[in-house]
């Protein structure tokens, strides 16, 4: 066994991977983590909701508060015959640790814990507070997870100063990318009403597909905004269109369209809703439209947290990191409501949600070292 596969972070990552915590089942991961943190003086609060396990852990009672956030749940393994080794039996081969959750994001959680253990052992009287916010409902509908903890904290006026979400953000090598924000996500379910009829007698019917087509073309052609330094322009995409009975001689009576905005911080959800309705109304459509806002955009500028994490990456692995807001949503969108500086950082994401998910062995302990250096920078009087 190599040094990379015998360290404390590797060992804890394997313990977590071996628990088949398919969302929303925590499978005892939070209890394992709490048992590691209890001797360090952490206080624990379970904020479980509707079968979802949520843990808030904090050491210290003063500011600044540095929180590590993440999720213990994983996506289903998929067809087992596609895996070269059982997905919940951590396996080492070819310089990689394989298993469901290895990259997304049990190695990050293990790295949080071991970084905290070393930091507290060396600096038991550090300034401020260390916190962990963990959930088993990130890969699912995410309505009973992190958002419930944030609501509880906000309800008693508790705020965070810095938060690192351990999502796998690196692209080619550990440390090359920090996510310092995410676009918002606004979805719509549109039902265009027509009149069903026989295709041979279109004058006796109203085809909702034909009526919607010009509006679709206009919506698809709109440049919603120009983006900004950190965000690309807002996009509008149709994901599903459904109409008809399956017969080729029946004009459908309704057409259902599912679409999604991924929007930059320069646009608001209300503005996008209003502009969409203007287009639909201008085309004279008879319609119903239901909206779902699953996440507002958030952005962390080049402040103390970005600087501390970037320096930690450079000092540990010699990589000059880049800031990015690309990709989907994360639980950072909830945490941003109670924290001004939220970033995501973790291992390479090339295999997440795939068969044979893995993390590089030689990235595991360095990831923990990066988190520890970030603690040093933000919770020691002189930042060292």
UniProtKB/Swiss-Prot annotation:
Sites where the protein binds Zn(2+) 2: 104, 139, 353
Pfam short name (any one): Peptidase_M20
Matches recorded under CDD domains: M20_DapE_proteobac (cd03891)
Enzyme class at the top of the EC tree: hydrolase
Domain of life the protein comes from: Bacteria
Active-site residues per Swiss-Prot or TrEMBL entry: 73, 138
Cofactor names: Zn(2+); Co(2+)
Reactions this protein catalyses: N-succinyl-(2S,6S)-2,6-diaminopimelate + H2O = (2S,6S)-2,6-diaminopimelate + succinate
Keyword Amino-acid biosynthesis: yes
NCBIfam families to which the protein is assigned, alphabetical: dapE_proteo, PRK13009.1
Self-association and partners: Homodimer.
Protein name: Succinyl-diaminopimelate desuccinylase
Gene: dapE
């Amino acid at each position: 066994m190599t040094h990379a596969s015998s360290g404390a972070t590797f060992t804890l990552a394997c313990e977590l991977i071996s628990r088949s915590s398919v969302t929303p089942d925590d499978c005892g991961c939070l209890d394992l983590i709490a048992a590691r943190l209890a001797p360090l003086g952490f206080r624990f609060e379970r904020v479980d909701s509707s079968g979802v396990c949520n843990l808030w852990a904090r050491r210290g009672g003063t500011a600044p508060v540095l929180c590590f956030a993440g999720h213990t749940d994983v996506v289903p393994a998929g067809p087992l015959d596609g895996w070269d080794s059982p997905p919940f039996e951590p396996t080492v081969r070819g310089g990689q640790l394989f298993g469901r959750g290895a990259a997304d994001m049990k190695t990050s959680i293990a790295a949080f814990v071991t970084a905290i253990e070393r930091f507290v052992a060396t600096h038991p009287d550090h300034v401020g507070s260390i916190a962990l916010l963990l959930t088993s409902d990130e890969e699912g509908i995410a309505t009973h997870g992190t958002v419930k903890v944030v609501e509880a904290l906000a309800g008693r006026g508790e705020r965070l100063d810095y938060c690192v979400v351990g999502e796998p953000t690196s692209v080619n090598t550990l440390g090359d990318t920090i996510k310092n924000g995410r676009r918002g996500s606004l979805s719509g379910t549109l039902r265009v009403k027509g009149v069903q009829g026989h295709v041979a007698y279109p004058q006796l019917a109203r085809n909702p597909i034909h009526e919607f087509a010009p509006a679709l073309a206009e919506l698809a052609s709109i440049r919603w905004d120009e983006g900004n330094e950190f965000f690309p322009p807002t996009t509008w995409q149709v994901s599903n269109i459904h109409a008809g009975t399956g017969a080729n001689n029946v004009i459908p009576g309704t057409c259902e369209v599912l679409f999604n905005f991924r929007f930059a911080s320069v646009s608001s959800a209300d503005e996008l809703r209003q502009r969409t309705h203007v287009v639909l109304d201008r085309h004279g459509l008879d319609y119903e439209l239901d909206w779902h806002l699953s996440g507002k955009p958030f952005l962390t500028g080049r402040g103390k947290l970005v600087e501390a994490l970037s320096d930690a990456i450079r000092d540990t692995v010699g990589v000059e990191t880049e800031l990015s807001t690309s990709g989907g949503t994360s639980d950072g969108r909830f945490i941003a409501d109670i924290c001004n500086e939220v970033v995501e950082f973790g291992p390479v994401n090339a295999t997440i949600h795939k068969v044979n998910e893995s993390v590089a062995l030689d990235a595991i302990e360095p990831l923990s070292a990066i988190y520890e250096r970030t603690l040093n920078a933000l919770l020691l009087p002189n930042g060292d």
